């Protein structure tokens, strides 16, 4: 199947979405060269999918130039550049037309296969008679420092998100299928300004049959994942060792995730059984080294795992596969995200069982299998186990089904004694009781004696006292006895 990116690549600058200032600068540059003026080559710098290569081909088509291109999947060392680019830079094509040389992704020149490539490019640019356009994602790499002095730099920004939907609508119309406007906007928003990625996503959805909103929601966010997609494209398409190993250099994903991506997309790209078998053989060897890294904690083996999974799988094919390939994230990641809720519920059940049985959650998993069988066969025993492990209704349903859950819960409900609710008696409002103040007891008065008797008794006592005093005066030497006191 032909790639829609190539099939619907704009043939003219008028068809290129956005980049008005860049298009005007290219027109002035090419017209001055046609007019006989000497101009430095152009270096278009910008993020992947911004339209750098498309602009180069569009300007060539508008002014009837043939194109010779070298890109990241080609070997670009000193000899190749000298033979291909050097010759084309100073000669006309077989049709008699002038030639535009396009050196794509020059910031990807690295390793032994591209040794001396940058230096040879600078040498060719100095003597080139035909126009040269170079493209780069990261123009500020140290290796391109000397090259920047030999070119005119034009920065190409990302395509605005609002410019992407019209392009997608036009492609859908030409391909003869209808697509919801919401889906088009979702594709555009997920692209992160990468028009090429948006077109690839549209083709991926279209090849899957009917395009649904749910499918569009699963599209990757290109702002964070575009590096891994670029890496997949390079690894699957190239047949050069250094190009393949450098493909994952700037990828933000860890090595284990990259391995999963390669494993998922290998059968999509390698259609020959021999190539596929060779590719998986190298991938399995890479997995062996990764296992040794994790077990021994010796990260020096990491480079062997990386080389086997990238260069090994890239060199496993006999030749490059042409055409469009629908790359996608590993299915295991999608499955894990969908089963996150059920896996969490199982963890909660295992924790409860492990707590009651004094074992680990790993050993508790064996108990779950027995519980499922018991739940389906004996409701009474199941009820006791549910109470013992303190399982909730949702957890029982997770292990069995709703019908069995109802039976177990009904048994539990029947075991519990029904407590009659006593209606509280109406209490009458207590009457107000006045406090009783005890009466103070009366002090009884002594009976009153007659006045005459009192006087007589008083006189007798006074006479007796007087007699006693007289007796004491008469006999002072008389010894005092007790009788005298009475």
UniProtKB/Swiss-Prot annotation:
It holds the Pfam family AAA. GO terms for molecular function: ATP binding; ATP hydrolysis activity; DNA clamp loader activity. Heteromultimer composed of small subunits (RfcS) and large subunits (RfcL). GO terms for biological process: DNA replication. Residues 419-486 are annotated as: Disordered. Residues 420-432, 442-480 have a biased composition (Basic and acidic residues). HAMAP family: RfcL. Belongs to the activator 1 small subunits family. RfcL subfamily. ATP binds at residues 46-53. This is Replication factor C large subunit. Part of the RFC clamp loader complex which loads the PCNA sliding clamp onto DNA. NCBIfam families: PRK04195.1-5 (NF003229), PRK04195.1-6 (NF003230). Keywords: ATP-binding, DNA replication, Nucleotide-binding. PANTHER family: CHROMOSOME TRANSMISSION FIDELITY FACTOR 18 (PTHR23389), REPLICATION FACTOR C SUBUNIT 1 (PTHR23389:SF6). It comes from the Archaea. InterPro entries: AAA+_ATPase, ATPase_AAA_core, P-loop_NTPase, Rep_factor-C_lsu, RFC_lid.
